[in-house]
Amino acid sequence: MLAPRLLAAIGNDPQRYGDDPNVLQCYAGTAPVRFQSGQIHRVKIRWACDKFLRHTVHLWANSFRRASVWGQTYYEQKRAQGMSHACALRCLGQRLLKIVFRMISDKKPYDAELHARNQTQHGSWVLALLNKNAPATPA
């Protein structure tokens, strides 16, 4: 149900967003707007974006967190940091959009094993939490 919405909103043209996943994330409204003046630093939700895509990413992130242990762990950690439900889903959506951007750029389908290897290689804090909370298996 969400795949057609994502395809319609994002498209499959690898040149559309250039070489930077941040362009797609800003377009989708998941990237926050940061501004500062003097000693004041603030972060706000991005309103200049495709609202249809932002809503689609919100629904996708919520579905993903329910279906994925990795997604649920990521979401729970963001909530523990004091983020609202919607903000935690936008953060998860940021990660998912980065993966989609790479899939579009490389013209390859999602590879869960490759994603797991990359997370291990880069020292993902989500994997560290998953490994810490995993039940010990008897030898």
Report each predicted region and the residues it spans.
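Coiled-coil termination/hinge junctions
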Residues: 1-2
